[in-house]
Amino acid sequence: MDTIIDAIASLPQDTLIVAVLYLGLSLLYLLIIPGFVYFYLNSRWYVASSFERAFMYFLMFFFFPGVLLLSPFLNFRPKRRQVNS
């Protein structure tokens, strides 16, 4: 464990900044923004206008790798209908 910490500490500061930026951007692209896209789609799917629906398709296309990564945990099934008897 000490050798890993020593190896990281011996790297130049520019390299560490770039590594942290890559890690942060990848987390943002693969987990955080697709989570927000999911909640946005879930709340607006049945009431969206045609322009908003096109925007939703764009978001789904652009963040597809992250949505695919989150897909085992997401529920895209329609809501249960109320049937009046």
UniProtKB/Swiss-Prot annotation:
Query: Between which residues do disulfide bridges form?
Result: none
- UniProt membrane topology term: Multi-pass membrane protein
Q: Name one Pfam family in it.
A: NdhL
The compartments listed are:
Cellular thylakoid membrane
According to UniProt, the reaction catalysed is: a plastoquinone + NADH + (n+1) H(+)(in) = a plastoquinol + NAD(+) + n H(+)(out); a plastoquinone + NADPH + (n+1) H(+)(in) = a plastoquinol + NADP(+) + n H(+)(out)
Q: Does the keyword Transmembrane helix apply?
A: yes
Output one GO MF annotation: oxidoreductase activity, acting on NAD(P)H, quinone or similar compound as acceptor
Q: According to the UniProt record, what class of enzyme is this?
A: translocase
Enzyme Commission numbers on file? 7.1.1.-
**Alphabetic keyword roster:** Membrane, NAD, NADP, Plastoquinone, Quinone, Thylakoid, Translocase, Transmembrane, Transmembrane helix, Transport
What is the first-listed, main subcellular location in coarse terms?
A: membrane
Transmembrane region(s): 17-37, 54-74
Extract one GO cellular component term from the record.
Answer: plasma membrane-derived thylakoid membrane
Q: What does this protein do?
A: NDH-1 shuttles electrons from an unknown electron donor, via FMN and iron-sulfur (Fe-S) centers, to quinones in the respiratory and/or the photosynthetic chain. The immediate electron acceptor for the enzyme in this species is believed to be plastoquinone. Couples the redox reaction to proton translocation, and thus conserves the redox energy in a proton gradient. Cyanobacterial NDH-1 also plays a role in inorganic carbon-concentration.
Q: Which HAMAP family match?
A: NDH1_NDH1L
Q: Give the record's subunit note.
A: NDH-1 can be composed of about 15 different subunits; different subcomplexes with different compositions have been identified which probably have different functions.
The UniProt family comment states: Belongs to the complex I NdhL subunit family.
What is this protein's record name?
NAD(P)H-quinone oxidoreductase subunit L
Organism listed in the record? Crocosphaera subtropica (strain ATCC 51142 / BH68)
Q: Which gene encodes it?
A: ndhL
